[in-house]
UniProtKB/Swiss-Prot annotation:
Pathway listed: Carbohydrate metabolism; pentose and glucuronate interconversion
One of the GO BP terms on file: D-glucuronate catabolic process
GO molecular function: ferrous iron binding; manganese ion binding; mannonate dehydratase activity
Record protein name field: Mannonate dehydratase
Swiss-Prot/TrEMBL catalytic activity: D-mannonate = 2-dehydro-3-deoxy-D-gluconate + H2O
Annotated source species: Flavobacterium johnsoniae (strain ATCC 17061 / DSM 2064 / JCM 8514 / BCRC 14874 / CCUG 350202 / NBRC 14942 / NCIMB 11054 / UW101) (Cytophaga johnsonae)
Broad enzyme group: lyase
KW Chloroplast (keyword) present: no
Function description: Catalyzes the dehydration of D-mannonate.
Length: 394
């Protein structure tokens, strides 16, 4: 596997020099400063590419040892997901961004089709047994937010009486500070998210999906794929759709990339090597019914990007992000399956350790949730060792 790390641009507390010291050679990043829906110009792409691939970001200096390997992500505009407003132009802009990236030698694009929120957590500093901090999604906390803070119309019909009682108890035990923090965690956006909302704005945004059910959102995704995949294929670009996180409906919104069946449908909608997926074990792994090694073995030829992460589930559907080799994901079997695919195809797929615990000296620093340096360094080192051990034993 090609070892990569995510970098959020010049304002990321983890610098490119830091990343170079981890042993990673690939950078996963995006042009976060460009508004959703606008074309990524060749000038902007080259500017970022030089910043990554040359020492001190100076084109006159030698290579830095890092390569911009994967784009994560070109955001899909909400109008495209809803097929409203200026969606036709936004699709054309997306195609142009793909063409421009290809001209600059960047040939892998991760993206998602999650409506409104990119990914959701209720606790950004959940303390685990060893004292490090992880990200957590608590189903009762989320229900408390939806029912009693957001007060989304119709939400009460989507929870059982038992769930509503647990949510009420959770809410009543919260302090005013707890409520503000929970709201911020969900609405203020996590790293990589492109939008942040107030409660009022969020309710309006959600209401735009009142008449878009799961099948309608799937149809809109399939239309998008039929438009962009031929362009990507013609330019040698590999698209890699990221699964829903968490992989089940929330906030009354449909989810369309949560299971192996979803993957099969979307890949069949526009058959091409360029219409592939991101194997995110942390997202798919939240569902016990997702066979992660099986998905890799059955669909590895369309696996264009890899996020390796583990979660620890409970019986209610809550989870926290476990250490990379712990939790519910059988990382040994997943990595073994990936290496089998690479051997079969004579390929080297880009992989990043997805998230990491905030630990050691990073506990004293301001970090992007999930993206502190030391936790990801630990994850990358563990995964590198696992890969070496499996390779030597094959």
């Amino acid at each position: 596997m090609e070892q990569t790390l995510r970098w959020f641009g010049p304002n990321d507390p983890v610098s490119l020099q830091d990343i170079a010291q981890t042993g990673a050679t690939g950078i996963v990043t995006a042009l976060h400063h460009i508004p959703n829906g606008e074309v990524w110009s060749i000038d902007e792409i080259i500017k970022r590419k030089v910043e990554i691939e040359h020492q001190d970001g100076d084109p006159k200096k030698g290579a830095s040892g890092l390569t911009w390997s994967v784009v994560e992500s070109i955001p899909v505009h909400e109008d495209i997901k809803k097929q409203t407003g200026n969606y036709i132009q936004y699709i054309e802009n997306y195609k142009e961004s793909i063409r421009n990236l290809a001209l600059c030698g960047i040939k892998c694009v991760c993206y998602n089709f999650m409506p409104v929120l990119d990914w959701s957590r209720t606790d950004l500093s959940y303390t685990v047994e060893d004292g490090s901090k992880a990200l957590r999604f608590d189903i009762n906390a989320f229900a408390a937010f939806e029912l009693f803070i957001l007060k989304r119309p119709g939400a009460e019909n989507e929870y059982s009486d038992e769930q509503k009682q647990k949510a009420k108890s959770y809410f009543e035990a919260m302090t005013a500070e707890d409520k503000v923090k929970l709201q911020q965690n969900i609405l203020a956006g996590l790293p990589g998210a492109e939008e942040a909302y107030t409660v009022e704005d969020f309710l309006v945004t959600l209401s735009a999906y009142n008449h878009i059910d799961r099948q309608a959102l799937k149809n809109n995704l399939f239309h998008f794929l039929k438009e962009i995949v031929p362009v990507a294929e013609s330019k040698g670009v590999l698209m890699a759709i990221h699964p829903d996180d968490p992989p089940y409906p929330i906030l009354g919104l449909p989810r369309v990339v949560s299971t192996e069946e979803d993957l099969i449908e979307l890949m069949n909608a526009a058959p091409s090597k360029s219409n592939g997926f991101t194997m995110c074990t942390g997202s798919y792994g939240v569902r016990a019914d997702n066979d992660l090694p099986g998905i890799v073995r059955r669909h590895g030829d369309k696996m264009n990007f890899i996020h390796l992460r583990s979660t620890q589930r409970d019986e209610e559907g809550s989870f926290y992000e476990a250490n990379h080799l712990e939790g519910d994901v059988d990382m040994y079997e997943v990595v073994k399956a990936i290496l089998e695919v690479e051997k079969r195809n004579n390929s080297k797929l880009p992989m990043r350790p997805d998230h990491g615990h905030q630990m050691l000296d990073d506990l004293k620093k301001k970090t992007n949730p999930g993206y502190s340096a030391i936790g990801r360094l630990r994850g990358l080192a563990e995964l590198r060792g696992l890969e070496l051990g499996i390779k030597r034993s094959l």
